[in-house]
């Protein structure tokens, strides 16, 4: 196992009115490791994930991500993605009325020399992404035409393709 640290959370604390949701939480993730957060409802699992992904602002502590100078404190979800943190949630967080290819590349569409979306390249790259996961589907079809389980796999494919350092799966197989 590689000993290279990609993520460190130190002293993360967060309080909701009347409830200490996180109390001085420390967490270290090394390259290649797989972790599972387990606990009862209300134990703080989702809150910790939301702090890491920029959804919740934590009150105390620091988050360090490999290759980023200094601590990452109360960053946004976009900052988290730019720093290599990808998340797939239990609820599919994609656009059902867009094609699979559009969903895979939303916000990072390949462009032509003229600055317009390069649809041919997007479709070709989308087919390659899905083929890498042994999924032979028509990427030009709208996401809503596929089962919820397949939509979840497409969300996972998108997260993996974003060249992430940390991939968080928040109950992604529940559907």
What are these regions (language model features)?
Residues 1-175:
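Glycine-rich phosphate-binding loops of nucleotide-dependent enzymes
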């Amino acid at each position: 196992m590689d000993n290279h640290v990609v993520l460190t959370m130190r002293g993360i604390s967060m309080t909701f009115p009347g409830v200490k949701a996180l109390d001085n939480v420390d967490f270290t993730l090394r390259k290649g490791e797989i972790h599972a957060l387990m606990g009862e409802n209300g134990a703080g699992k989702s809150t910790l994930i939301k702090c890491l992904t920029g959804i919740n602002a934590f009150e105390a502590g620091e988050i360090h991500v490999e290759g980023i100078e200094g601590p990452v404190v109360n960053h946004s979800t976009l900052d988290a993605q730019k720093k290599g943190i990808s998340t797939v949630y239990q609820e599919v967080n994609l656009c059902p009325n867009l094609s699979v290819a559009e969903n895979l590349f939303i916000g990072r569409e390949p462009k032509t020399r003229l600055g317009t979306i390069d649809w041919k390249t997007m479709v070709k790259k989308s087919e390659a992404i899905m083929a890498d996961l042994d999924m032979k589907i028509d990427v030009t079809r709208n996401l809503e035409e596929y089962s919820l389980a397949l939509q979840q796999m497409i969300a996972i494919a998108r997260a993996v393709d974003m060249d992430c350092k940390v991939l968080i799966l928040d109950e992604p197989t529940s559907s």
